[in-house]
Amino acid sequence: MGIPSASYSITMRVHLGADPLGIGRITTAVGEAAGTVVAVDIVESHPDLLVVDLTCNAVDARHADAITRAVGAIEGAVVHAVSDRTFLLHLGGKLEVASKVPLRTRDDLSMAYTPGVARVCRAIAANPADARKLTIKRNTVAVVTDGSAVLGLGNIGPEAALPVMEGKALLFKQFAGVDAWPVCLATQDTDEIVRAVEWLAPGYGGVNLEDIAAPRCFEVERRLRESLDIPVFHDDQHGTAIVVLAALANALRVVGKNLADTRVVLSGSGAAGVAIIKILQTEGAAQIVACDRAGVLHKRREGLDDSKRWVAEHTNPDGRTGTLRDALAGADVFVGVSGPGILEPDDLKPMAADAIVFALANPDPEVDPAGARRHAAVVATGRSDEPNQINNVLAFPGVFRGALDAGARTITEAMKVAAARAIAARVHDDELRPDYIVPSVFDRGVAPGVAEAVRHAAGERPRE
């Protein structure tokens, strides 16, 4: 069984009789059912009745049901209601539009809206660049998805993707002050996605592509980067790649190795995998071997799509063949952006001394982290309940903050590398250790540091 977490947190409204040990009995029941008690709040107290709200964390929904049954089985305890705290948090959505301008007088109204707003409209019509300083455009990002590759849920459609996009927008605002808004498109046709974003672009200062399946995501991003004069950034690719580079730079410091001299094995040749390859090569990695479900990608393999063909032609200089396990022999680094449980811990044993393992599949990594630590000096995952969490939130808020502030028209590879270096630098020499190679997602210095680095790397004077 996994570890109880807040993502499966419930609150039970429990009625207890006069038994003074009632609270102790129900909290014990939660513990015996392998749950974690978070809080006990007394709602009502009477001589013969005690009403409490019992909040606890579970491993999953089925486990939460089992905990509820265990509490209800206690003599004298009656569970009257159960609330899923995650669903409660999402009621009515997680975002709202707030006004920056007071509307208390006729003067306020005549300046914010008609007739005064017409003068501003004419100014922008005469000089469209003024939209950046006279509208929300300079600080607004569209979070665009077609719902085709949402988290580990797959192709669930635009409506079901909306809670994730809301969460993304929330992170933009919380960590970098960027006003982001979900744009969930009811199409998975590449031409229609590109056209829709082009039509919407005048109202935004940047476009964050999210959860669009490969290989479609590559063409969508490429075409939008060519046609728009605002930054376009596919976070599943580049956000992941930036944080992987940051974490790997620090992990290599821990084990005393250089990226140029290491052999990296990568599992997963989708959106994130391709971006990781590109950013590592930009930083000097020369020995990268990529694998998919069928094994090592190499130039002689047939039946590869365009993205995998690119990977085969730009990696694996020694022409290695075989399986993922074959590729791991003697490798210094394993990076997994593929699927759960594809490796056993002992599969890592043939790796080089002081190996580095990044098993980033979510929610279940490619290899058990505890088992991986028997064979690797540094282990990272994508999970918040494990040390060294590789989380895109370390990158994308600051990347867009810096790009928007610089008035950048695109996000270059140099800007991505600068972001990675800024993230890595947040872990100081006296803090660096095998279980601390990336800063906390709640480190308030990360986004400003990334923004400054990106702004400097943009090499452009801010557009007014």
Q: Where are the model-predicted features located?
A:
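A conserved regulatory-domain signal marking ACT and ACT-like small-molecule sensing domains
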Residues: M1-G93
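Flexible, glycine/charged-enriched surface loops at secondary-structure junctions
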Residues: V38-V43, H80-V82, V183, E210, ...
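Short, structured coil segments at secondary-structure junctions
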Residues: E75, A176, S227-L228, G284, ...
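Glycine/serine-rich phosphate-binding loop and adjoining beta1-alpha1 elements at the start
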Residues: V79-T262
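Glycine-rich phosphate/diphosphate-binding loop of Rossmann-like nucleotide-binding domains
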Residues: L151, I156-A176, L228, H234, ...
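Adenosine-phosphate binding glycine-rich loop
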Residues: P231, D235-D236, V255-N258, A359-E464
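Rossmann-like adenosine-cofactor binding region
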Residues: R309-V378, R383-D385
